[in-house]
Amino acid sequence: MANGNSFGVLFCVTTYGESHGGAVGVVVDGCPPRLPLSEADIQAELDRRRPGQSPITTPRQEADRCQILSGVFQGFTLGTPIHILVRNQDARPQDYQEMATTFRPSHADATYQAKYGIRNWQGGGRASARETIGRVAAGAIAKKILRLAAGVEILAYVQRVKDVEAQVDPSSVTAEQVEANIVRCPDPQAAAAMIQKIEEAAREGDSLGGVVECVARRVPRGLGSPVFDKLEADLAKAVMSLPASKGFEIGSGFAGTYLTGKQHNDEFYMTPGGWRTRSNRSGGIQGGISNGEDIVLRVAFKPTATIRQPQNTVTLNGQETVLAARGRHDPCVLPRAVPMVEAMVALVLCDHLLRHHAQCGSLVLSEVPLPVAAAPQA
């Protein structure tokens, strides 16, 4: 865990591989046994994040076909580590020769060199978004566990590209609406404007950033482990570990700071199924614990660092120079970041679901009388 390549407590994932190495992949440890699982379950999610899927993504062509090497037998998980491998087939390390000695502005080149004294400059190595293949593969397993165990649905979409903002109701948006266009924005009018902006940036050799919003529905109450492992804290860490992420907010987020307590509080009311909240400014989490309402969060992604426009930079030996980067890169990471965000949210929720049942769901203590609060004295 100290090396930063593993994530999770009970549902633990470890990713490996580099952008232009032989393969990338993941080992998932802690998956419950007897879960029906096939390569097709994982492939469906990998296809959503693979490169070359549309004119507004990187032109790199990778099939990203997954292989399950262990942990599954006759279509069911064994409860042992699951190893998933994806081979790289369209690597072009020669496109990155200049990066061997020149740092890309706002990229991990300089900081990896400063930390390790060595780096894989071919496509960014571990700093490449290609590392997220392992996350998405593991997220596919987590999604299936959540769906079968609790009916949880996780759905992300592009909410903003640069200054083009979509109008989306997270409580009613559907997967069909998200996947209806190449930018993965469920607002058709905004999607058309976003695509135009991305195409313009690509023609100019530049890039754009924006915001991905994610909703998790039917999350059981009680997930989260205060005080240091609050659910929103782990969600923030998860999505902020994604490449190019620069901001996180949940529920009302920063906008909530403009409200009073009376305006912001989510009032309770009773239904036949128990208590609910009339609003959801808490974003489905109170006190670090899920409250049963939709979990709604947003992640800000910066513009892609590697661009064809000339930029001032320095070399490995300290010389100032100008770099116009080559290689194949997304002019905007957001369309492919959608399944990445979903995967990281799924990993957190699955881990906390298992942790909750381990702590609170295994022992029956109904025979033990609970203390009753004494009535106040008159």
From Swiss-Prot:
It holds the Pfam family Chorismate_synt. Reduced FMN (FMNH(2)). InterPro entries: Chorismate_synth, Chorismate_synth_AroC_sf, Chorismate_synthase_CS. Its cofactor is FMNH2. PROSITE patterns: CHORISMATE_SYNTHASE_1, CHORISMATE_SYNTHASE_2, CHORISMATE_SYNTHASE_3. Residues 42-61 are annotated as: Disordered. NADP(+) binds at R49. This is Chorismate synthase. It comes from Synechococcus sp. (strain JA-2-3B'a(2-13)).
